[in-house]
């Protein structure tokens, strides 16, 4: 009964949730039915709290649909069912029970660390000073779990997204958290080009065996911008074997890229396939509230009072990435220090006038319409027409939502630009896209791709 009921729940959840979300939160759960109580076991407190907070109502609803009023009561606990049941239809390749991997990793604590391994993570990047929002919530949660259970939670963890969105911050945060938990952990952070350089140097010095031993004896290997392996066949060959060795040893691998693994050109298919063995999570451009929070956090760190209206003014006009936001605020702070003037909207307009002018020039409604039409391979005239077929209506709604997000035009102005539509039509389109971004991985991916294109 347990296997049958929970398997049906799993099948429903796998159909309804994005694959990354399902793999991260639902797949690790184990189920046990006793005395008309269905107990779901989570591997740790973090997962338990998240699942109970985010999925309790959804799972209860599925159970009620399947069993009616006589369905079992749902409860949560931490631990492992003695005989795990009910796996998802397509379990992650290479996955193993979390508790076994955790014990394996922790058993290395008594091993004498090799003296030539020196952690090079930046201690200034932590989970505590990473500003969380809807755009990066899943990535941060995955990174946090990996830090708590290296080699066991998600291996490899693959984070992808545009420049300046926080991927590197999370890499360092994981490394620092692992080191804090296990002082002698061998954690190596590097850019992919450094791996290539080290390998070339090892080949030149006839020291390839030392190179292999070094990289295959770490507890956690954190590699940034893996797309730079493209067209470097010898480096890919060596990393392929290093990857396999680390995975077999339950040693953690975290990779980042500016694009989804399968979209990385010039990288062998066997590597791209392995990149997806664990968990792949996107980091999206930050939404308005997160951009404001980032600015306020940065101002606090610099002991600068940033009025709310100023933070919103900057955040509404600079949308592409965190690095751009922080750079703009640094310029505002520097100008305020040099001139002794108060930070207000007029002052910010002056301090950032070239940056704001460039942003407004880059992102126009006309530019958005052309970009969306090209992205979906439809005619611009159709996008602006009265046609209601889904192949045209959905891109039109996306374009309207992007215009509201990326420009300072009012809803009536946006409606006029889309063939004289009412502002209520634009508002409906924006709300519909927000809903679809929660429900459809494809829509969420398209929206993020378009924002990256328009903001680059």
Curated annotation (Swiss-Prot):
<feature type="binding site">
    <location>
        <position position="167"/>
    </location>
    <ligand>
        <name>ATP</name>
    </ligand>
</feature>
<feature type="region of interest" description="Domain II">
    <location>
        <begin position="83"/>
        <end position="119"/>
    </location>
</feature>
<dbReference type="InterPro" id="IPR013317">
    <property type="entry name" value="DnaA_dom"/>
</dbReference>
<dbReference type="InterPro" id="IPR003593">
    <property type="entry name" value="AAA+_ATPase"/>
</dbReference>
<dbReference type="GO" id="GO:0005524">
    <property type="term" value="F:ATP binding"/>
</dbReference>
<dbReference type="Pfam" id="PF00308">
    <property type="entry name" value="Bac_DnaA"/>
</dbReference>
<dbReference type="GO" id="GO:0008289">
    <property type="term" value="F:lipid binding"/>
</dbReference>
<protein>
    <recommendedName>
        <fullName>Chromosomal replication initiator protein DnaA</fullName>
    </recommendedName>
</protein>
<dbReference type="GO" id="GO:0006275">
    <property type="term" value="P:regulation of DNA replication"/>
</dbReference>
<feature type="region of interest" description="Domain I, interacts with DnaA modulators">
    <location>
        <begin position="1"/>
        <end position="83"/>
    </location>
</feature>
<comment type="subunit">
    <text>Oligomerizes as a right-handed, spiral filament on DNA at oriC.</text>
</comment>
<keyword id="KW-0238">DNA-binding</keyword>
<dbReference type="InterPro" id="IPR027417">
    <property type="entry name" value="P-loop_NTPase"/>
</dbReference>
<comment type="similarity">
    <text>Belongs to the DnaA family.</text>
</comment>
<keyword id="KW-0446">Lipid-binding</keyword>
<dbReference type="GO" id="GO:0006270">
    <property type="term" value="P:DNA replication initiation"/>
</dbReference>
<dbReference type="InterPro" id="IPR001957">
    <property type="entry name" value="Chromosome_initiator_DnaA"/>
</dbReference>
<dbReference type="GO" id="GO:0005737">
    <property type="term" value="C:cytoplasm"/>
</dbReference>
<feature type="binding site">
    <location>
        <position position="164"/>
    </location>
    <ligand>
        <name>ATP</name>
    </ligand>
</feature>
<feature type="binding site">
    <location>
        <position position="166"/>
    </location>
    <ligand>
        <name>ATP</name>
    </ligand>
</feature>
<dbReference type="InterPro" id="IPR020591">
    <property type="entry name" value="Chromosome_initiator_DnaA-like"/>
</dbReference>
<dbReference type="InterPro" id="IPR024633">
    <property type="entry name" value="DnaA_N_dom"/>
</dbReference>
<dbReference type="InterPro" id="IPR018312">
    <property type="entry name" value="Chromosome_initiator_DnaA_CS"/>
</dbReference>
<comment type="function">
    <text>Plays an essential role in the initiation and regulation of chromosomal replication. ATP-DnaA binds to the origin of replication (oriC) to initiate formation of the DNA replication initiation complex once per cell cycle. Binds the DnaA box (a 9 base pair repeat at the origin) and separates the double-stranded (ds)DNA. Forms a right-handed helical filament on oriC DNA; dsDNA binds to the exterior of the filament while single-stranded (ss)DNA is stabiized in the filament's interior.</text>
</comment>
<dbReference type="InterPro" id="IPR038454">
    <property type="entry name" value="DnaA_N_sf"/>
</dbReference>
<dbReference type="GO" id="GO:0016887">
    <property type="term" value="F:ATP hydrolysis activity"/>
</dbReference>
<keyword id="KW-0547">Nucleotide-binding</keyword>
<feature type="region of interest" description="Domain III, AAA+ region">
    <location>
        <begin position="120"/>
        <end position="336"/>
    </location>
</feature>
<keyword id="KW-0963">Cytoplasm</keyword>
<dbReference type="GO" id="GO:0003688">
    <property type="term" value="F:DNA replication origin binding"/>
</dbReference>
<dbReference type="Pfam" id="PF08299">
    <property type="entry name" value="Bac_DnaA_C"/>
</dbReference>
<dbReference type="InterPro" id="IPR010921">
    <property type="entry name" value="Trp_repressor/repl_initiator"/>
</dbReference>
<feature type="region of interest" description="Domain IV, binds dsDNA">
    <location>
        <begin position="337"/>
        <end position="456"/>
    </location>
</feature>
<keyword id="KW-0067">ATP-binding</keyword>
<dbReference type="InterPro" id="IPR013159">
    <property type="entry name" value="DnaA_C"/>
</dbReference>
<dbReference type="GO" id="GO:0005886">
    <property type="term" value="C:plasma membrane"/>
</dbReference>
<feature type="binding site">
    <location>
        <position position="168"/>
    </location>
    <ligand>
        <name>ATP</name>
    </ligand>
</feature>
<dbReference type="Pfam" id="PF11638">
    <property type="entry name" value="DnaA_N"/>
</dbReference>
<keyword id="KW-0235">DNA replication</keyword>
């Amino acid at each position: 009964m347990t296997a049958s009921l929970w398997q049906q729940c799993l099948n429903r959840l796998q159909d309804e949730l994005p694959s990354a979300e399902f793999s991260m939160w639902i797949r690790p759960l184990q189920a046990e039915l006793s005395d008309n109580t269905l107990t779901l076991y989570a591997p740790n407190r973090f997962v338990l709290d998240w699942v109970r907070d985010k999925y309790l109502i959804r799972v209860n609803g599925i159970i009620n649909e399947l069993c009616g009023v006589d369905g079992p009561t749902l409860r949560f606990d931490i631990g492992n069912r003695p005989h795990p049941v009910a796996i998802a239809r397509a379990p992650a390749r290479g996955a193993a029970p979390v508790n076994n991997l955790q014990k394996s990793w922790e058993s290395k604590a008594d091993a004498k660390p090799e003296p030539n391994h020196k952690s090079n993570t930046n201690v200034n990047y932590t989970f505590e000073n990473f500003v969380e929002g809807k755009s990066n919530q899943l990535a941060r949660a995955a990174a946090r779990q990996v830090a708590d259970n290296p080699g066991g939670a998600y291996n490899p963890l693959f984070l992808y997204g545009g420049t300046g969105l926080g991927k590197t911050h999370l890499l360092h945060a994981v490394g620092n958290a692992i080191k804090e938990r296990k002082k002698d952990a061998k954690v190596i952070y590097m850019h992919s080009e450094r791996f290539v350089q080290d390998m070339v140097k090892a080949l030149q010095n006839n020291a390839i065996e030392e190179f292999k031993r070094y990289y295959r004896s770490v507890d956690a290997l954190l590699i940034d911008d893996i797309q730079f392996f493209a067209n470097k066949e010898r480096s890919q060959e060596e990393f392929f074997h290093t990857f396999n060795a680390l995975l077999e040893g339950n040693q953690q691998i975290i990779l980042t890229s500016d694009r989804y693994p399968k979209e990385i050109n010039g990288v062998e298919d066997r590597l791209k396939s392995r990149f997806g063995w664990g968990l792949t999570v996107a980091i999206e451009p930050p939404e308005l509230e997160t951009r404001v929070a980032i600015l306020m956090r940065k101002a606090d760190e610099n002991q600068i009072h940033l009025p709310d209206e100023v933070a919103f003014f900057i955040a509404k006009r600079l949308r592409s990435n965190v690095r751009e936001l922080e750079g703009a605020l640094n310029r505002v702070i520097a100008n305020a220090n040099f001139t002794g003037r108060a930070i207000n909207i007029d002052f910010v307009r002056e301090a950032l006038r070239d940056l704001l002018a460039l942003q407004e020039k880059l992102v126009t409604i006309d530019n958005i319409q052309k970009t969306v039409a090209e992205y979906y391979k439809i005619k611009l005239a159709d996008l602006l027409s009265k046609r209601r077929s889904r192949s045209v209506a959905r891109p039109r709604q996306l374009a309207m939502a992007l215009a509201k997000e990326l420009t300072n035009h009012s809803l009536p102005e946006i409606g006029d630009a889309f063939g004289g539509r009412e502002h209520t039509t634009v508002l409906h389109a924006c709300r519909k896209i927000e809903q679809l971004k929660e429900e459809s991985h494809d829509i969420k991916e398209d929206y993020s791709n378009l924002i990256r294109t328009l903001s680059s």
